[in-house]
Design a protein with these regions (language model features):
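A general structural signal for well-ordered alpha-helical segments in protein cores
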Residues: 9, 28-29, 59-60, 72, ...
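Conserved AdoMet
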Residues: 32-109
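Non-catalytic accessory regions of SAM-dependent methyltransferases
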Residues: 1-42, 48-51
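Conserved SAM/SAH cofactor-binding pocket of Class I
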Residues: 100-133
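Generic leucine side-chain signal with a strong bias for well-ordered alpha-helical environments
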Residues: 16, 26, 32, 43, ...
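Alpha-helical structural motif
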Residues: 1, 8, 55-59, 68, ...
């Protein structure tokens, strides 16, 4: 049976929600974007279009990985932090949204220090805070 991007998204979101994944809406969108090689804007634009059987299979593989407990950031290999897209692998911790508060405070302190201020990001995992600052 032919499936649209919208139906595939809704099904993926429902399965993630049923599994107790809090950010099911965001994660379903990220998995579909990754599987289809589309930006968020392209995905929203194409919601009424039909998907190929190959794309359905690809999304199913990704959903199975997620349901097995693999974080979506590791599946797609990218995560956004403070508006910056970062390459992510299992070698680094996934930047968390609450760490953006730390980045914001560091930015404010750096600005307050003026031109002579310096910032050192030492042994900081992915380096996301240093990049944001």
């Amino acid at each position: 049976m032919a499936t649209t991007y919208n139906n595939l998204y809704l099904d993926t979101r429902a399965r993630l929600r049923k599994a107790g994944i809090d950010a099911a809406q965001l994660e379903a969108r990220e998995l579909l974007c990754y599987a289809s090689d589309k930006s968020r804007e392209q995905l929203y634009r194409d919601m009424s279009l039909y998907v190929s059987a190959e794309l359905e299979r690809r999304v199913e593989e990704l959903v199975q990985r997620r349901l097995a407990g693999e974080p979506v950031a590791y599946i797609v290999g990218e995560w956004e932090f403070y508006g910056l897209p970062l390459d992510i692998s299992s070698d680094v911790l996934i930047p968390r949204s609450d760490t953006e508060v730390l980045a914001e405070r560091a930015i404010l302190r750096a600005r307050a220090a003026g031109e002579g201020g310096r910032v050192l990001d030492l042994c900081a995992g992915s380096g996301c805070v240093g990049l944001a600052v």
